[in-house]
């Protein structure tokens, strides 16, 4: 259900360039997207889990803030990330 350490490490290397570059906006968005996908499948199976629903909404809001920041700072990196993660339809 949750995103494992190995998955986070792989996403960090893929979007950050190295394993220690965890603060990069693209890495944070990629990890949040993986966690959101995991929570979404959990919510399909457990419709009455209100705590997980709240956690899902918090992660979606955090990802939205980070994407808004990235769009404001560097539109090309934003577009590349959106395309890579298949976000925004």
UniProtKB/Swiss-Prot annotation:
Keywords: Ribonucleoprotein, Ribosomal protein, RNA-binding, rRNA-binding
Pfam families recorded: Ribosomal_S15 (PF00312)
Disulfide-bonded cysteines: none
Keyword rRNA-binding in annotation: yes
Gene that this sequence comes from: rpsO
Assigned GO CC terms: cytosolic small ribosomal subunit
SUPFAM superfamilies, per the entry: S15/NS1 RNA-binding domain
Summary of the function given for this chain in its UniProt record: One of the primary rRNA binding proteins, it binds directly to 16S rRNA where it helps nucleate assembly of the platform of the 30S subunit by binding and bridging several RNA helices of the 16S rRNA. Forms an intersubunit bridge (bridge B4) with the 23S rRNA of the 50S subunit in the ribosome.
Domain of life of the source: Bacteria
One Gene Ontology term from the biological process aspect of the record: translation
Name assigned to this protein: Small ribosomal subunit protein uS15
Family membership: Belongs to the universal ribosomal protein uS15 family.
PROSITE patterns according to UniProt: RIBOSOMAL_S15
């Amino acid at each position: 259900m949750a995103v494992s350490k190995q998955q986070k490490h792989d996403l960090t290397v893929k979007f950050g360039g190295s394993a220690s570059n965890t603060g990069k906006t693209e890495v944070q968005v990629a990890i949040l997207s993986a966690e959101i996908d995991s929570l979404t499948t959990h919510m399909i199976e457990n419709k009455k889990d209100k705590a997980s629903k709240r956690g899902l909404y918090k992660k979606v809001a955090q990802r939205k803030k980070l994407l808004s920041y990235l769009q404001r700072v560097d539109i090309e990196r934003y577009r590349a990330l959106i395309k890579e993660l298949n976000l925004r339809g």
